[in-house]
Amino acid sequence: MNYRKFGNTGEKISALGFGCMRFPEYEKDGKMYVDQDKVDEMVAEAYRQGVNYFDTAPKYCNCNSEEAVGRAVKGFRDKVLLSTKIPLDVCKKPGDYRRALEHSLDKLGTDHLDFYHFWGINRKEFDQTIMAQDLLADAAKAKEEGLIRHISFSFHDEPLAIKYIIDESKKRGIPMESMLVQYNLLDRTNEEMLHYAASNGVGTVAMGPVGGGRLAAPTELYAKLTGKKSIATYELAFKFVLGNPDLNCALSGMQTLDMVKQNAKLASDSTGFSKEEWQQLGEAMEQLKKFSELYCTGCKYCQPCPAGIEIPKIFNMFTYYNVYGLKDHATP
């Protein structure tokens, strides 16, 4: 496994991070449960392969992810970096930040978090909730008490808002130490801000490195770009993300043991793109522009649909058929 300096946190982070929002689940008596045995196997294999960053959140996997992660890493908790998040909609009155933090600590079965993110924020929420309620001070107090080690944020907004959040936090004397943002071969809108964050000592993690699976189907794209033997677009996408010197970790939502092994192999590879190959990715972007008309990361936040429609699955089938021409794969 390759490791990278994680901003100014003092940590070394694995190039591959384990996103814990797509654990295998099963239904029993009308309720969804995480398959703990499979999760234990996947997490143990990831750890064995060198992955040291595990990212979860209170609402992942029908609110079962944090507990599942806590159980899975119990035997090596002190050797890995645990990351979770606080949804701002729970912060309505004084003390809510602390209550949410303590709830996550309890679910994860740990006495501290390595990274605690303000979850999915934008500039408006930063101003009207984080700053207005002085939640940075709550985070700083929790850090002083050893309940969290690093203050972080995940982000969904216009790229320039990243600079605003980093700068304003620093002005308050409570700097953001790491961030989690969307970044992949399909969506490079945050590329400039990744550089800004890295230049300011903020650790950087990319969510959606393969576009929610949209970049996983086979094509001849790599062969077209380089004249070399074709590789999966999935591998091309991963190498692109990990090839960015401003990016510390690619966070992958892994669902199977095979995915863990495949991703760990890619993140352990010492070979990457040459400067010329990197420049040629502009051509790749032209070919992939057709994705932009229907872009889905597979997060399933649109589920359940009131009409019972499996929206992510339909989008996935559409992509296989319309973009790749893989008719057999486009059959549910």
Report residues per predicted region.
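N-terminal binding-site loop/beta-alpha segment at the start of enzyme catalytic domains
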Residues: 1-80, 138, 144
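A general structural detector for well-ordered alpha-helical segments in enzyme core domains, enriched
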Residues: 2, 38, 42, 65-72, ...
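Conserved, mostly hydrophobic/aromatic
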Residues: 6, 18, 46, 54, ...
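Local beta-strand N-terminus motif with an aromatic residue
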Residues: 13, 54, 79-80, 110-113, ...
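A cross-family glycoside hydrolase active-site/sugar-binding cleft signature
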Residues: 16-21, 57, 83-85, 116-119, ...
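Glycine/proline-rich, positively charged
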Residues: 26-27, 34, 91-206, 222-223, ...
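Structured C-terminal cap/extension of enzyme domains
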Residues: 47, 52, 71, 170-172, ...
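Short, electropositive alpha-helical surface patch
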Residues: 67-81, 136, 166-179, 264-270
